[in-house]
Amino acid sequence: VQDPQYSLALKGGVTSFHILPGSANLIGGRGVTVKNLQRNTINSMKFPKAPHSLKMACGENPKRVYGNRGQAPSTRMGNAAGYRKSWIQAEGYLRRLNEYEEKSDEAKELEYAPTRDLEMETLTGVLKGEILVHNHCYRADEMATMIDIAKEFNYKITAFHHGVEAYKIADLLADNGICGALWA
């Protein structure tokens, strides 16, 4: 919000930004689209009605970060397993929320609401189509795996970032309405 680069970017014609967390984690966190305005809070800069996004990463980055620590996921297969585990948990969380919401007001008074979980709220937002997925993947096989996982859990990938091998699966990306955010 107080970065002097905002005014420099504006001079170059940049009127808005999509700010994402880093790409070391399988599920990195939420992103936000903002207008390039000099304001004191990020909320006052948010682009009207722009959905939040979720940054995810596969392949090299999580493999390197966690592998160097001797932790999982340290392989590409471990990446896929970690995603599937998280999406299964998110489906369960969403199911519990829906079951609770379907109850009458009287029944709700007798039962506790499901415990709030911010990570699961973000993932269920993806499953409900409210949060857009931006996935950091370099390799074509990794992107194809991520598309398979997205289909398995019925969510959409909006964009692959740094997809240097996206050209190898251009038809697959086009068929699934996925764009690439690549280096120039």
Residue ranges and their predicted role:
Residues 143-144, 164-184:
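Catalytic core of soluble alpha/beta enzymes
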